[in-house]
Amino acid sequence: MAAQLGLVLDCVDPDKLAVFWSVAIGYTTRGRAGTYVLLVDETGRQPKLLLQRVTEPKAGKNRMHFDIETPTVDEEVARLEALGAQRLEALPVEEHGNRWVVMVDPEGNEFCVCNAGQAG
């Protein structure tokens, strides 16, 4: 079997973030074990997301972030804000024909909402 990409996100409360991210990206909670919560895309086309409990809160900017790609950036931002995400910048960034909004999840992990196919 070829290697597959899996993502691990450190967090203080993996159960809380599991609710946010499962609704945000349409994943399903597949299991819990100790300090971990596993989220999966039921189609199997997207990488698994493992939420790992850590004792220290997030400090500083992420070295890597998620892009949520959508044809309707403003509507997606509003939906994610209703789930508990917040904008980091009041206005969208527009550059080289691309448009995105920088946001944070309920624990402050940065991610972007961007035009479909125009990841930033």
Locate predicted features:
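Vicinal oxygen chelate
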Residues: 2-12, 23, 31, 37-40, 56-80, 99-104, ...
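Hydrophobic ligand-binding cavity/cleft-lining segments
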Residues: 12-20
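Short alpha-helical
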Residues: 16, 46, 75
